[in-house]
Regions:
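Non-catalytic, usually N-terminal nucleic-acid engagement modules in DNA/RNA processing proteins
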Residues: 1-84, 88
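Catalytic cores of enzyme domains
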Residues: 44, 51-52, 80-168
Length: 168
């Protein structure tokens, strides 16, 4: 059996798979990761913006968060901040790799959830609510500081999500 592949003759333990998947996220640089309550997302998100609208056989939504800027980054001029201020891309890179890891290791279709806008509804409407995924995965809570989520230990984070047909 190749490294990082399951034995298809033995039953899959969802708890072991979940632990390995969340461990992958942390190893790759996420500060927090969790599995969101898919039923709650489907109930809360508006039609056309639910995970099953993009991936009809989705069974799990994995959410991960990476740290925001350092305190020092907030003190530099804007032109300097444009080069090193955002860690958002790191979250997307981890999620992209995670989708491939889940497919390779668990033979379950997976997709990196795009944070992009809905091309039919315009620039103020996201295709999916990455914040909703993070909140329902327990890695962020709504803040009085604005339309953001905060983690109790890490504060402001950037989030990304992966949809998979693997039931966790």
């Amino acid at each position: 059996m190749a490294k990082n592949q399951i034995d298809i003759d033995s039953p899959l333990d969802p708890n072991e798979a979940k632990e390995a998947i969340l461990g992958y996220c942390l190893k790759k640089g996420a500060l927090a990761a969790g599995v969101a309550d898919l039923d709650a997302i489907e109930r809360i998100a508006p039609a056309g913006h639910r995970p099953s609208d993009l991936m009809p056989r989705v069974k799990s939504v994995i959410s991960l968060g990476v740290g925001g800027q350092t305190q020092g980054a907030w003190t530099v001029p804007a032109k300097a901040l444009t080069f090193f201020g955002s860690t958002e891309g790191r979250a997307y890179s981890i999620a992209y790799g995670l989708a491939f890891m889940v497919e390779r290791a668990y033979l379950a279709r997976s997709v990196y959830c795009p944070p992009d806008i809905d091309p039919e509804l315009g620039s103020r409407v996201p295709l999916q609510s990455i914040k909703l995924h993070a909140e329902l995965a327990g890695i962020g809570a709504r803040s009085l500081a604005g339309d953001i989520l905060l983690h109790p230990e890490y504060g402001y984070m950037y989030f990304a999500s992966v949809f998979t047909e693997l039931e966790l």
